[in-house]
């Protein structure tokens, strides 16, 4: 291809046009880790509406806790639901502009058939939904991926 600056171009004279300009090295993004709690109760899962501001503002997500907390204790103390662990699903990484998020999904089964959270959680901030209903909600892509990952477990446990 012809370039009007070719005669004065050092890169062209030294056959370096494919190598120049050298891109700046990418900035290393900080990494944050979190645990998403995928709670199953019969044919439903629990979703929580996120605050309007911040990441995924106003979208529906799984209840979330820090990686150093125990999921069974967290569910009892914060969600008022007694659970048993089913599985830890593979980690999911999602990259935002300013950081990488590593999600550790914990799949949990409600021990009670009528979770107390329906009565004691903040009004309109939690919903028990079927996976089909959840997929119709405003949910971020990582939550959609986690729902797909959990689906085989979900099918198995409602037909036990």
Q: Can you annotate each of these PLM segments?
A:
Residues 1-160:
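Intrinsically disordered, low-complexity, charged terminal extensions of DNA damage-control enzymes
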């Amino acid at each position: 291809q012809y370039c009007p600056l070719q005669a004065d171009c050092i890169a062209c004279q030294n056959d370096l046009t494919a190598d120049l300009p050298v891109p700046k090295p990418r900035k290393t993004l900080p990494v944050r880790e979190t645990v998403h709690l995928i709670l199953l109760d019969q044919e439903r899962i629990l979703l929580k509406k996120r605050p309007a501001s911040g990441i995924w503002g106003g979208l529906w997500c799984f209840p979330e806790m820090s990686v150093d907390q125990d999921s069974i204790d967290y569910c009892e103390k914060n969600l008022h639901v007694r659970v048993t662990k089913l599985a830890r699903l593979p980690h999911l990484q999602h990259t935002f502009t300013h950081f990488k998020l590593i999600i550790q999904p914990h799949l949990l089964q409600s021990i009670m058939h009528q979770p107390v959270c329906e009565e004691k959680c903040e009004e309109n901030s939690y919903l028990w939904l079927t996976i089909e209903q959840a997929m119709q909600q405003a949910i971020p892509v990582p939550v959609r991926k986690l729902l797909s990952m959990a689906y085989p477990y979900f099918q198995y446990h409602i037909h036990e």
